[in-house]
Amino acid sequence: MSGRGKSGKARTKAKSRSSRAGLQFPVGRVHRFLRKGNYAKRVGGGAPVYMAAVLEYLTAEILELAGNAARDNKKSRIIPRHLQLAVRNDEELNKLLGGVTIAQGGVLPNIQAVLLPKKTGKSS
């Protein structure tokens, strides 16, 4: 007796929903958060997969831009300042995260045109 019931087939190895969808973000955890968050009475099977994919895409986009900002500043480690520069210099991400404050992010370098010294070019 192998304890496998009547079928006698060996049980296949469990495969996570994240690996089935080809994602790094945890589909099961997103599903749990959707259920516990009281967003709706019921949550479909595809909803957490789609949401995990969207979150993974946005994270990858921000990390790529922040990595470029870190490389521009000759740094090998991404700090909150690099995240701030990445988000605020990208038009779409800036619109999406318009009301978000990034701690230790600072501000974009910007000098108003009226504060710059006057151009006194002599053309004679």
Swiss-Prot record:
Cellular localization per UniProt: Nucleus; Chromosome
Pfam families associated with the record: Histone, Histone_H2A_C
Covalent cross-link Glycyl lysine isopeptide (Lys-Gly) (interchain with G-Cter in ubiquitin) as placed by the record, residue numbers: K119
Biased composition (Basic residues): 1-18
PTM: Monoubiquitination of Lys-119 gives a specific tag for epigenetic transcriptional repression. Phosphorylation of Ser-2 directly represses transcription.
This protein's UniProt keywords: Acetylation, Chromosome, DNA-binding, Isopeptide bond, Methylation, Nucleosome core, Nucleus, Phosphoprotein, Ubl conjugation
InterPro entries: Histone-fold, Histone_H2A, Histone_H2A/H2B/H3, Histone_H2A_C, Histone_H2A_CS
Transmembrane segments: none
GO molecular function terms listed in the Swiss-Prot or TrEMBL record: DNA binding; protein heterodimerization activity; structural constituent of chromatin
Domain of life, per lineage: Eukaryota
Positions carrying N-acetylserine: S2
PROSITE patterns: HISTONE_H2A
PANTHER family in UniProt: HISTONE H2A
Similarity comment: family membership: Belongs to the histone H2A family.
Described purpose of this protein according to its UniProt entry: Core component of nucleosome. Nucleosomes wrap and compact DNA into chromatin, limiting DNA accessibility to the cellular machineries which require DNA as a template. Histones thereby play a central role in transcription regulation, DNA repair, DNA replication and chromosomal stability. DNA accessibility is regulated via a complex set of post-translational modifications of histones, also called histone code, and nucleosome remodeling.
Description of how the protein assembles with itself and partners: The nucleosome is a histone octamer containing two molecules each of H2A, H2B, H3 and H4 assembled in one H3-H4 heterotetramer and two H2A-H2B heterodimers. The octamer wraps approximately 147 bp of DNA.
The protein's name: Histone H2A
Taxon lineage: Eukaryota, Metazoa, Echinodermata, Eleutherozoa, Echinozoa
